[in-house]
Amino acid sequence: MRRSHEKEMMDFPDNPKQVLDEDLRNLRTLNRYLGGYRSVMRGLDRLVGAGKLSRFSLLDVGTGSGDIPARITNWAQHRGIKASIVALEPEPVTARVAAILTQKQTNPLFIPLLQRGKEGDFRRCGISVVRGDGNAPPFRAASFDFVLASQLLHHFSEEKIVALLRTWSRLARRAIIISDLVRHPIAYYGIRLVTKLFTRNVMTLTDAPLSVQRAFTMAEWCELFRRAEIGPFQVFSVFPYRVLALVSPKR
């Protein structure tokens, strides 16, 4: 199966809000049942455990609806670990969804506080949802222990991915966590079947299989990390058809 370069519907601006909201809900469902959460948490658990960390900071680039930062926050709270998370999202409508979702899914005892700063920040009980671009994140070098990109890199060309990894390597003190899809015919036909069974949302039905077509094989993912030349990396296969990569930036 050759890689597709066709853009997903989500990559275009001005999608109808109702269609986008439903698609984001569907993505949360797919993350829950098809390994999106499991992949990220496996990587984070490995890194936090290896460092015996009692606290950490994390930047989630292209956070979408913020469900993964919310899951990380709850995971950390249950282990007595203090997590400080910035969820970066360029789209204003999606950033608002993330702000609301993270407030609902984390500690309900916190009083909601909405702050709009220069970058359009939305702060919610340990998670700051910030409007910003992953190409030029508005943060200083070495601002975070970890930089996370979940199901984001497959949206870009190989050259762009290498450039993004180099940009993020300057922000991460400890590691970059990449969780994404693996291109495979079984994954493609499988997600087509699964999405047709539970939704009629045109964005989900279009983008879910296209995401698999736009993804890379395991060998191609490894080659991208080598090309970036930002430091040693470990790559793991996560069921079903996901890649988890932990990259340690050179200093």
Functional labels for PLM-detected ranges:
Residues 59, 65-105, 126-136:
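Class I SAM-dependent methyltransferase SAM/SAH-binding core
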Residues 17-42, 47:
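Class I SAM-dependent methyltransferase Rossmann-like catalytic core
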Residues 172-181:
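Conserved beta-strand signature within the Rossmann-like core of class I S-adenosyl-L-methionine
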Residues 116-120:
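Glycine-biased, low-complexity coil/linker segments
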Residues 148:
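A conserved beta-strand element that flanks and buttresses the S-adenosyl-L-methionine
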Residues 181-226, 234:
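C-terminal alpha-helical "lid/dimerization" subdomain adjacent to the S-adenosyl-L-methionine
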Residues 156-167:
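A short, conserved alpha-helix within the catalytic core of class I
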Residues 235-251:
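Core SAM-dependent methyltransferase catalytic element
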